[in-house]
Amino acid sequence: MKTGDKALVDPKLTGLETWVEGKVIDIENNPFKGVVIAIEDKDGRIFFGEEKYFKAA
């Protein structure tokens, strides 16, 4: 996954009922959490978390 790709974020991270689709806006290698991904959805909401909560759309 790279910046600009479409991705889905797990409801376990968002607290919503369904997977949310968005565009990857940042990928960071966090020394404590590993790879952390941030996406922005069509409503302008930003979700970020560990790589395990994301999948390619």
Name each region found by the language model.
Residues 3-56:
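Basic/aromatic-rich interaction segments and small domains that mediate binding to polyanionic partners
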